[in-house]
């Protein structure tokens, strides 16, 4: 009898606790619909079920906030201003948001779990961002580890971007085998040397990443991207390869791809100052976009130079395009430095790292480098070396423009 009584009492206690938890949850967590008020504008505001991330809620209502990392909290792009609701700022946001910005309501939309009504502010340009389903025109190697992806915009549509802007590209869950990649013979040596065809990329959920555009606004009807394959570093050979770059490298003509945009902050200043562009690797993309825009669309008379770093001649691309621009424009010069020229290159040009070449062959004798505008995009080590060199020359932050995505 005592055992039965004990079981009954235990069951009653568990039931009572369950009821208490459910009651507390009903009071503390909004499981119904909430309202997101945007810019105090009823036409932009919406109602949705509580519990999702703000970034996802906005996207599902056709409002696409930039998020290069796909909502992982690592890029810090999806900034919104929350005027009411949203709870306390999370530790994951503090590396991207200063104390002053936090006091002003700045949050990362991908980290805000919406449990109550919100009042938020968004920049007006966000409402011009749209989605398109594009068709792959071509996807060809331009260098050993870089492909040029050319996408066709749907007939009659226009992506109203500015030079230096970027789009976001979406990938559904997939499995990609590197052995299936179409890598031309001239580039296969390094792929075989590093045994790269053994890799596979597996995505179990949708992925979104940002890529800078290589085309300029008057190249109508297309989107042009330079995509470097993100293989595991030699020091961590068992790490997974990059999901999005692997997906893009697997694309073939005729495939469909969803993009959203345009986004961007890496825009040219409207001044008469000299422009110095510095790039490396897939950082070529925004360099091409800017330089083509300045010389082909704007017919700029500003003094412009482009300094590009590559390993060897095989890693150079768009060479004929820039040679032609140089021949047609007296105000434009471009220079390449090879860090590891091969014997077959028969290279007689600059050698070494591009920041040293730029300094030794131009900036050290420049009468006023601090008056120039510097636009750069490349591998992180290149970016850091260039910025240090420019700071040592007295160039202010306002004249150093960096695109973090193209490299």
Swiss-Prot record:
Entry keywords, A to Z: 2Fe-2S, Cell inner membrane, Cell membrane, FAD, Flavoprotein, Ion transport, Iron, Iron-sulfur, Membrane, Metal-binding, NAD, Sodium, Sodium transport, Translocase, Transmembrane, Transmembrane helix, Transport, Ubiquinone
Gene Ontology molecular function terms on file: 2 iron, 2 sulfur cluster binding; electron transfer activity; metal ion binding; oxidoreductase activity, acting on NAD(P)H, quinone or similar compound as acceptor
CDD domains: NADH_quinone_reductase (cd06188)
Residues binding [2Fe-2S] cluster, per UniProt: 69, 75, 78, 110
Domain FAD-binding FR-type span(s) in chain numbering: 129-269
SUPFAM superfamilies reported for this sequence: 2Fe-2S ferredoxin-like, Ferredoxin reductase-like, C-terminal NADP-linked domain, Riboflavin synthase domain-like
Any Pfam family hit: Fer2
Subcellular location: Cell inner membrane
Annotated membrane topology: Single-pass membrane protein
2Fe-2S ferredoxin-type domain residues: 32-126
Membrane-spanning parts: 3-23
Record's subunit section: Composed of six subunits; NqrA, NqrB, NqrC, NqrD, NqrE and NqrF.
Protein's UniProt name: Na(+)-translocating NADH-quinone reductase subunit F
Organism per entry: Yersinia pseudotuberculosis serotype I (strain IP32953)
């Amino acid at each position: 009898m005592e055992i039965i009584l004990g079981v009954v009492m235990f069951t009653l206690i568990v039931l009572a606790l369950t009821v208490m938890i459910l009651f507390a949850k009903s009071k503390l967590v909004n499981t119904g619909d909430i309202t997101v008020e945007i810019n105090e504008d009823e036409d932009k505001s919406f109602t949705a079920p509580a519990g999702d991330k703000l970034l996802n809620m906005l996207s599902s209502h056709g409002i696409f906030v930039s998020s290069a990392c796909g909502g992982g909290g690592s890029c810090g792009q999806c900034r919104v201003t929350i005027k009411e609701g949203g709870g306390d700022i999370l530790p994951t946001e503090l590396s991207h948001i200063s104390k002053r910005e936090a006091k002003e309501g700045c949050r990362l939309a991908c980290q805000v779990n919406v449990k109550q009504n919100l009042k938020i502010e968004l920049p007006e340009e966000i409402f011009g961002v749209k989605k398109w389903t594009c068709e792959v025109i071509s996807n060809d190697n331009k260098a050993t580890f870089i492909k040029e992806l050319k996408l066709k915009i749907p007939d009659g549509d226009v992506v109203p971007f500015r030079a230096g802007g970027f789009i976001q590209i979406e990938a559904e869950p997939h499995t990609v085998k590197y052995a299936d990649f179409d890598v031309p013979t001239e580039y296969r040596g390094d792929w075989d040397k590093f045994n790269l065809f053994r890799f596979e990329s597996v995505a179990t959920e949708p992925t979104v990443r940002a890529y800078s555009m290589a085309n300029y606004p008057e190249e109508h009807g297309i989107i042009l991207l330079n995509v470097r394959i993100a293989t595991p570093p030699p020091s961590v050979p068992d790490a997974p390869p990059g999901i999005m770059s692997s997906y893009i490298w697997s694309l073939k003509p005729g495939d469909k791809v969803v993009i959203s945009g345009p986004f961007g902050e890496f825009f040219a200043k409207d001044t008469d100052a000299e422009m110095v562009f510095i790039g490396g690797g897939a950082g070529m993309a925004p360099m091409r976009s800017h330089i083509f825009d300045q010389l082909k669309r704007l017919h700029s008379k500003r003094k412009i130079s482009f300094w590009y770093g590559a390993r060897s001649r095989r890693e150079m691309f768009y060479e004929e395009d820039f040679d032609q621009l140089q021949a047609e424009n007296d105000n434009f010069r471009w220079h390449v430095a090879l860090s590891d020229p091969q014997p077959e290159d028969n290279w007689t040009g600059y050698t070494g790292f591009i920041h040293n070449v730029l300094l030794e062959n131009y900036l050290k004798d420049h009468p006023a480098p601090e008056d120039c505008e510097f636009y750069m995009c490349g591998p992180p080590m290149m970016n850091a070396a260039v910025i240090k060199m420019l700071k040592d020359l007295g160039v202010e932050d306002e004249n150093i423009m960096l695109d973090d995505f193209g490299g």
